[in-house]
Protein backbone atom coordinates (compact mmCIF):
# COMPACT_ATOMS: atom_id res chain seq x y z
CA UNK A 1 0.00 0.00 0.00
CA UNK A 2 2.84 2.39 0.89
CA UNK A 3 4.54 1.68 -2.46
CA UNK A 4 1.28 2.34 -4.33
CA UNK A 5 0.84 5.68 -2.55
CA UNK A 6 4.44 6.62 -3.36
CA UNK A 7 3.92 5.82 -7.06
CA UNK A 8 0.70 7.84 -7.16
CA UNK A 9 2.51 10.76 -5.49
CA UNK A 10 5.37 10.55 -8.01
CA UNK A 11 2.91 10.41 -10.92
CA UNK A 12 1.07 13.44 -9.52
CA UNK A 13 4.33 15.40 -9.37
CA UNK A 14 5.18 14.37 -12.93
CA UNK A 15 1.74 15.46 -14.13
CA UNK A 16 2.15 18.82 -12.38
CA UNK A 17 5.52 19.31 -14.08
CA UNK A 18 3.94 18.45 -17.44
CA UNK A 19 0.98 20.81 -16.98
CA UNK A 20 3.29 23.59 -15.78
CA UNK A 21 5.10 23.49 -19.14
CA UNK A 22 1.81 24.36 -20.83
CA UNK A 23 1.32 27.41 -18.60
CA UNK A 24 3.94 29.29 -20.62
CA UNK A 25 3.04 31.17 -23.79
CA UNK A 26 6.02 29.86 -25.80
CA UNK A 27 4.68 26.36 -26.35
CA UNK A 28 1.25 27.66 -27.42
CA UNK A 29 2.85 30.20 -29.74
CA UNK A 30 4.90 27.43 -31.35
CA UNK A 31 1.87 25.19 -31.85
CA UNK A 32 -0.53 27.81 -33.18
CA UNK A 33 2.16 29.33 -35.42
CA UNK A 34 2.55 25.87 -36.96
CA UNK A 35 0.18 26.45 -39.87
CA UNK A 36 0.40 22.84 -41.09
CA UNK A 37 -0.83 21.64 -37.70
CA UNK A 38 -3.43 24.33 -37.03
CA UNK A 39 -4.86 24.52 -40.55
CA UNK A 40 -4.89 20.72 -40.67
CA UNK A 41 -7.14 20.61 -37.63
CA UNK A 42 -9.27 23.50 -38.89
CA UNK A 43 -9.85 21.83 -42.26
CA UNK A 44 -10.57 18.46 -40.68
CA UNK A 45 -13.09 19.93 -38.23
CA UNK A 46 -14.85 22.13 -40.78
CA UNK A 47 -14.99 19.25 -43.28
CA UNK A 48 -16.84 17.31 -40.58
CA UNK A 49 -19.50 19.98 -40.16
CA UNK A 50 -22.24 17.51 -41.09
CA UNK A 51 -21.05 15.14 -38.35
CA UNK A 52 -20.73 17.95 -35.76
CA UNK A 53 -23.82 20.01 -36.60
CA UNK A 54 -25.97 20.40 -33.50
CA UNK A 55 -23.91 17.91 -31.50
CA UNK A 56 -21.71 17.80 -28.38
CA UNK A 57 -17.89 17.71 -28.47
CA UNK A 58 -15.20 17.00 -25.88
CA UNK A 59 -11.86 18.76 -26.47
CA UNK A 60 -9.18 16.84 -24.53
CA UNK A 61 -6.20 19.02 -23.61
CA UNK A 62 -7.84 22.14 -25.04
CA UNK A 63 -4.91 24.50 -24.44
CA UNK A 64 -5.87 27.99 -25.60
CA UNK A 65 -9.22 26.72 -26.88
CA UNK A 66 -8.69 27.21 -30.60
CA UNK A 67 -9.92 23.71 -31.52
CA UNK A 68 -13.06 24.23 -29.44
CA UNK A 69 -13.71 27.43 -31.38
CA UNK A 70 -13.27 25.54 -34.66
CA UNK A 71 -15.84 22.97 -33.46
CA UNK A 72 -18.43 25.67 -32.79
CA UNK A 73 -17.69 27.20 -36.19
CA UNK A 74 -18.41 23.75 -37.64
CA UNK A 75 -21.83 23.73 -35.98
CA UNK A 76 -21.32 22.05 -32.60
CA UNK A 77 -23.97 23.07 -30.09
CA UNK A 78 -21.87 22.42 -27.00
CA UNK A 79 -18.14 21.88 -26.41
CA UNK A 80 -16.47 20.80 -23.18
CA UNK A 81 -12.92 22.18 -23.34
CA UNK A 82 -10.87 20.30 -20.74
CA UNK A 83 -7.47 21.80 -19.91
CA UNK A 84 -5.45 21.00 -16.77
CA UNK A 85 -2.92 23.84 -16.96
CA UNK A 86 -3.39 27.47 -15.92
CA UNK A 87 -3.79 28.45 -19.58
CA UNK A 88 -7.42 27.32 -19.21
CA UNK A 89 -8.14 30.84 -17.92
CA UNK A 90 -6.90 32.26 -21.20
CA UNK A 91 -8.96 29.69 -23.10
CA UNK A 92 -12.02 31.14 -21.35
CA UNK A 93 -11.01 34.61 -22.56
CA UNK A 94 -10.57 33.30 -26.12
CA UNK A 95 -14.04 31.75 -25.97
CA UNK A 96 -15.56 35.00 -24.69
CA UNK A 97 -13.71 37.11 -27.25
CA UNK A 98 -15.21 34.97 -30.00
CA UNK A 99 -18.74 35.19 -28.57
CA UNK A 100 -19.03 31.50 -27.72
CA UNK A 101 -19.62 31.55 -23.94
CA UNK A 102 -22.98 29.91 -24.37
CA UNK A 103 -21.52 26.99 -26.34
CA UNK A 104 -18.05 26.29 -24.91
CA UNK A 105 -17.55 25.32 -21.27
CA UNK A 106 -13.90 25.43 -20.18
CA UNK A 107 -13.00 22.97 -17.42
CA UNK A 108 -9.71 23.43 -15.55
CA UNK A 109 -8.97 19.80 -14.76
CA UNK A 110 -7.14 16.72 -15.98
CA UNK A 111 -9.60 14.77 -18.10
CA UNK A 112 -9.34 11.83 -15.69
CA UNK A 113 -10.95 13.92 -12.93
CA UNK A 114 -13.18 16.14 -15.08
CA UNK A 115 -16.91 16.26 -14.38
CA UNK A 116 -18.73 16.10 -17.69
CA UNK A 117 -22.48 15.69 -17.24
CA UNK A 118 -23.29 13.87 -20.48
CA UNK A 119 -22.06 11.58 -23.20
CA UNK A 120 -20.54 13.33 -26.22
CA UNK A 121 -20.88 12.82 -29.96
CA UNK A 122 -17.26 13.60 -30.81
CA UNK A 123 -13.82 13.93 -29.25
CA UNK A 124 -11.14 16.24 -30.61
CA UNK A 125 -7.60 16.37 -29.29
CA UNK A 126 -4.15 17.43 -30.37
CA UNK A 127 -2.37 14.81 -28.28
CA UNK A 128 0.68 14.03 -30.41
CA UNK A 129 4.23 14.61 -29.21
CA UNK A 130 7.65 14.11 -30.73
CA UNK A 131 7.84 10.62 -32.28
CA UNK A 132 4.06 10.63 -31.73
CA UNK A 133 4.27 9.29 -28.17
CA UNK A 134 6.46 11.74 -26.23
CA UNK A 135 4.49 13.36 -23.38
CA UNK A 136 2.11 10.40 -23.43
CA UNK A 137 -1.22 12.25 -23.69
CA UNK A 138 -2.88 9.53 -25.75
CA UNK A 139 -3.94 7.52 -22.66
CA UNK A 140 -6.06 10.52 -21.61
CA UNK A 141 -7.81 10.49 -24.99
CA UNK A 142 -8.50 6.76 -24.67
CA UNK A 143 -9.82 7.31 -21.15
CA UNK A 144 -12.18 10.02 -22.41
CA UNK A 145 -13.30 7.85 -25.32
CA UNK A 146 -14.14 4.92 -23.07
CA UNK A 147 -15.97 7.06 -20.52
CA UNK A 148 -17.87 9.68 -22.53
CA UNK A 149 -17.99 8.94 -26.28
CA UNK A 150 -21.35 7.69 -27.51
CA UNK A 151 -21.46 4.50 -29.60
CA UNK A 152 -20.80 5.51 -33.19
CA UNK A 153 -19.21 8.80 -32.12
CA UNK A 154 -16.20 10.21 -33.96
CA UNK A 155 -12.65 10.92 -32.84
CA UNK A 156 -10.54 13.63 -34.46
CA UNK A 157 -8.00 12.42 -35.48
CA UNK A 158 -9.09 8.80 -35.74
CA UNK A 159 -5.85 7.08 -36.82
CA UNK A 160 -2.10 7.46 -36.45
CA UNK A 161 0.86 5.86 -38.24
CA UNK A 162 4.54 5.80 -37.29
CA UNK A 163 7.35 5.64 -39.85
CA UNK A 164 11.07 4.93 -39.74
CA UNK A 165 13.84 5.46 -42.31
CA UNK A 166 17.66 5.35 -42.36
CA UNK A 167 19.29 8.78 -42.68
CA UNK A 168 22.43 10.70 -43.44
CA UNK A 169 22.50 13.84 -41.27
CA UNK A 170 24.62 16.52 -42.91
CA UNK A 171 24.30 18.70 -39.81
CA UNK A 172 26.18 16.09 -37.80
CA UNK A 173 29.05 16.06 -40.30
CA UNK A 174 29.15 19.86 -40.31
CA UNK A 175 29.30 20.02 -36.52
CA UNK A 176 32.07 17.43 -36.38
CA UNK A 177 34.08 19.03 -39.19
CA UNK A 178 33.92 22.37 -37.37
CA UNK A 179 36.61 21.23 -34.93
CA UNK A 180 38.98 20.54 -37.82
CA UNK A 181 38.34 24.04 -39.15
CA UNK A 182 39.09 25.98 -35.96
CA UNK A 183 42.82 26.15 -36.77
CA UNK A 184 42.07 27.91 -40.04
CA UNK A 185 39.85 30.39 -38.23
CA UNK A 186 41.95 31.21 -35.18
CA UNK A 187 45.34 29.51 -35.60
CA UNK A 188 44.59 27.02 -32.81
CA UNK A 189 44.39 23.29 -33.55
CA UNK A 190 41.31 21.91 -31.77
CA UNK A 191 40.85 18.76 -33.85
CA UNK A 192 41.20 16.74 -30.63
CA UNK A 193 37.69 17.94 -29.75
CA UNK A 194 36.13 15.95 -32.59
CA UNK A 195 35.89 12.59 -30.74
CA UNK A 196 34.33 14.34 -27.76
CA UNK A 197 31.83 16.13 -29.99
CA UNK A 198 31.08 12.83 -31.70
CA UNK A 199 30.23 11.14 -28.39
CA UNK A 200 28.04 14.07 -27.34
CA UNK A 201 26.07 14.21 -30.59
CA UNK A 202 25.68 10.51 -31.37
CA UNK A 203 24.52 9.47 -27.92
CA UNK A 204 21.48 7.74 -26.47
CA UNK A 205 19.22 10.78 -26.39
CA UNK A 206 16.65 11.12 -29.15
CA UNK A 207 17.19 14.34 -31.08
CA UNK A 208 14.59 16.53 -32.77
CA UNK A 209 15.73 18.13 -36.01
CA UNK A 210 14.46 18.98 -39.45
CA UNK A 211 15.54 16.73 -42.32
CA UNK A 212 15.29 17.21 -46.06
CA UNK A 213 14.25 14.47 -48.50
CA UNK A 214 17.90 14.18 -49.59
CA UNK A 215 18.84 13.01 -46.08
CA UNK A 216 16.64 9.91 -46.33
CA UNK A 217 18.57 6.87 -47.58
CA UNK A 218 15.70 4.49 -48.39
CA UNK A 219 11.94 4.34 -48.74
CA UNK A 220 10.38 4.74 -45.28
CA UNK A 221 8.62 1.86 -43.54
CA UNK A 222 5.44 2.17 -41.50
CA UNK A 223 6.14 0.18 -38.34
CA UNK A 224 3.09 0.94 -36.19
CA UNK A 225 -0.54 1.96 -36.72
CA UNK A 226 -3.20 3.00 -34.24
CA UNK A 227 -6.96 3.03 -34.71
CA UNK A 228 -8.11 5.50 -32.07
CA UNK A 229 -11.63 4.15 -32.20
CA UNK A 230 -10.58 0.83 -30.68
CA UNK A 231 -6.95 0.92 -29.44
CA UNK A 232 -6.42 0.10 -25.77
CA UNK A 233 -4.25 1.54 -23.02
CA UNK A 234 -2.13 -1.60 -23.12
CA UNK A 235 -1.55 -1.38 -26.88
CA UNK A 236 -0.24 2.19 -26.79
CA UNK A 237 2.24 1.43 -24.00
CA UNK A 238 4.42 -0.58 -26.37
CA UNK A 239 4.49 0.26 -30.07
CA UNK A 240 6.59 -2.33 -31.88
CA UNK A 241 7.37 -3.04 -35.50
CA UNK A 242 10.01 -4.40 -37.83
CA UNK A 243 11.69 -2.84 -40.85
CA UNK A 244 13.71 -3.75 -43.92
CA UNK A 245 15.42 -1.18 -46.14
CA UNK A 246 17.42 -1.22 -49.35
CA UNK A 247 19.65 1.86 -49.59
CA UNK A 248 19.39 4.22 -52.56
CA UNK A 249 23.14 4.76 -52.99
CA UNK A 250 26.55 5.38 -51.44
CA UNK A 251 26.37 7.43 -48.23
CA UNK A 252 27.23 7.59 -44.56
CA UNK A 253 24.47 6.21 -42.36
CA UNK A 254 24.19 8.22 -39.13
CA UNK A 255 21.05 6.63 -37.77
CA UNK A 256 17.30 6.51 -38.21
CA UNK A 257 14.50 9.07 -38.32
CA UNK A 258 10.99 8.68 -36.94
CA UNK A 259 7.92 10.64 -37.96
CA UNK A 260 4.17 10.22 -37.94
CA UNK A 261 0.92 11.00 -39.69
CA UNK A 262 -2.55 11.35 -38.23
CA UNK A 263 -5.73 10.97 -40.27
CA UNK A 264 -9.10 12.62 -39.74
CA UNK A 265 -12.33 10.92 -40.82
CA UNK A 266 -15.00 12.52 -42.96
CA UNK A 267 -16.32 12.83 -46.48
CA UNK A 268 -12.96 14.35 -47.40
CA UNK A 269 -10.13 12.65 -45.51
CA UNK A 270 -7.51 15.01 -44.08
CA UNK A 271 -4.01 13.77 -43.23
CA UNK A 272 -1.56 15.72 -41.12
CA UNK A 273 2.00 14.59 -41.87
CA UNK A 274 5.32 15.30 -40.15
CA UNK A 275 7.31 13.63 -42.93
CA UNK A 276 10.54 15.21 -44.24
CA UNK A 277 8.87 15.00 -47.66
CA UNK A 278 6.15 17.42 -46.56
CA UNK A 279 5.92 20.93 -45.15
CA UNK A 280 7.79 21.68 -41.93
CA UNK A 281 5.94 21.25 -38.64
CA UNK A 282 7.02 22.03 -35.08
CA UNK A 283 7.33 18.25 -34.52
CA UNK A 284 10.09 18.09 -37.18
CA UNK A 285 11.56 14.54 -37.12
CA UNK A 286 12.92 12.49 -34.25
CA UNK A 287 16.43 11.13 -34.80
CA UNK A 288 18.09 8.04 -33.36
CA UNK A 289 21.84 8.21 -33.90
CA UNK A 290 24.04 5.12 -34.03
CA UNK A 291 27.24 5.05 -31.97
CA UNK A 292 29.28 5.27 -35.17
CA UNK A 293 28.39 6.31 -38.70
CA UNK A 294 28.51 3.44 -41.19
CA UNK A 295 29.22 3.50 -44.92
CA UNK A 296 26.40 2.04 -47.02
CA UNK A 297 26.16 1.51 -50.77
CA UNK A 298 23.37 1.11 -53.28
CA UNK A 299 21.12 -1.81 -52.30
CA UNK A 300 22.74 -2.29 -48.89
CA UNK A 301 20.14 -4.10 -46.79
CA UNK A 302 19.22 -2.79 -43.35
CA UNK A 303 16.90 -4.89 -41.20
CA UNK A 304 15.69 -4.71 -37.64
CA UNK A 305 12.91 -3.74 -35.29
CA UNK A 306 12.00 -0.93 -32.93
CA UNK A 307 9.91 -0.59 -29.78
CA UNK A 308 8.62 2.68 -28.29
CA UNK A 309 7.46 2.65 -24.68
CA UNK A 310 7.03 5.03 -21.71
CA UNK A 311 10.00 5.69 -19.46
CA UNK A 312 10.08 3.76 -16.19
CA UNK A 313 11.05 6.98 -14.40
CA UNK A 314 8.40 9.24 -15.91
CA UNK A 315 5.62 7.72 -18.05
CA UNK A 316 5.23 10.99 -19.96
CA UNK A 317 8.77 10.57 -21.26
CA UNK A 318 9.80 8.14 -23.96
CA UNK A 319 12.29 5.38 -24.54
CA UNK A 320 13.15 3.40 -27.67
CA UNK A 321 14.77 0.03 -28.17
CA UNK A 322 16.39 -0.35 -31.59
CA UNK A 323 17.73 -3.63 -32.99
CA UNK A 324 19.38 -3.48 -36.40
CA UNK A 325 21.68 -5.26 -38.84
CA UNK A 326 23.44 -3.64 -41.79
CA UNK A 327 24.48 -5.54 -44.89
CA UNK A 328 23.77 -8.87 -43.24
CA UNK A 329 26.26 -8.11 -40.49
CA UNK A 330 26.12 -8.46 -36.73
CA UNK A 331 22.79 -7.63 -35.12
CA UNK A 332 23.23 -4.63 -32.82
CA UNK A 333 21.08 -3.09 -30.12
CA UNK A 334 20.86 0.46 -28.83
CA UNK A 335 18.63 2.01 -26.17
CA UNK A 336 17.42 5.60 -26.51
CA UNK A 337 15.50 8.01 -24.34
CA UNK A 338 13.69 11.34 -24.59
CA UNK A 339 13.41 12.99 -21.20
CA UNK A 340 14.45 10.99 -18.15
Swiss-Prot record:
Ranges for domain SAM-dependent MTase PRMT-type: 15-339
GO BP, one annotated term: DNA repair
Reaction catalysed by this enzyme: L-arginyl-[protein] + 2 S-adenosyl-L-methionine = N(omega),N(omega)-dimethyl-L-arginyl-[protein] + 2 S-adenosyl-L-homocysteine + 2 H(+)
Domain of life: Eukaryota
Binding site for S-adenosyl-L-methionine: 28, 37, 61, 83, 112
InterPro entries: Arg_MeTrfase, PRMT_dom, SAM-dependent_MTases_sf
Localization terms from the record: Nucleus
The enzyme's E.C. designation: 2.1.1.319
Xref: Gene3D superfamilies: Hnrnp arginine n-methyltransferase1, Vaccinia Virus protein VP39
Summary of the function given for this chain in its UniProt record: Arginine methyltransferase that can catalyze the formation of both omega-N monomethylarginine (MMA) and asymmetrical dimethylarginine (aDMA), with a strong preference for the formation of aDMA. Preferentially methylates arginyl residues present in a glycine and arginine-rich domain and displays preference for monomethylated substrates. Specifically mediates the asymmetric dimethylation of histone H3 'Arg-2' to form H3R2me2a. H3R2me2a represents a specific tag for epigenetic transcriptional repression and is mutually exclusive with methylation on histone H3 'Lys-4' (H3K4me2 and H3K4me3).
The protein's name in its UniProt record: Protein arginine N-methyltransferase 6
Organism (species): Xenopus laevis (African clawed frog)
Origin organism lineage: Eukaryota, Metazoa, Chordata, Craniata, Vertebrata
Gene expressing this chain: prmt6
Amino acid sequence: MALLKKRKHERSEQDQEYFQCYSDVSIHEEMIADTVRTNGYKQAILHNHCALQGLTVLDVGAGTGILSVFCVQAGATRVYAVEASAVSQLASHVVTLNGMDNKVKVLNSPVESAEIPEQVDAIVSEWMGYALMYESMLPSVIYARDKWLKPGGIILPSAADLFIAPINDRVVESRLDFWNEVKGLYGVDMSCMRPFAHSCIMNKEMAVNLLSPEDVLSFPVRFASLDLNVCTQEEVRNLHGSFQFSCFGSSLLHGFALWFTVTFPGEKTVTLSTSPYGEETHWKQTLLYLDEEIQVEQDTDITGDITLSPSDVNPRHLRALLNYSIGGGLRRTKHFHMGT
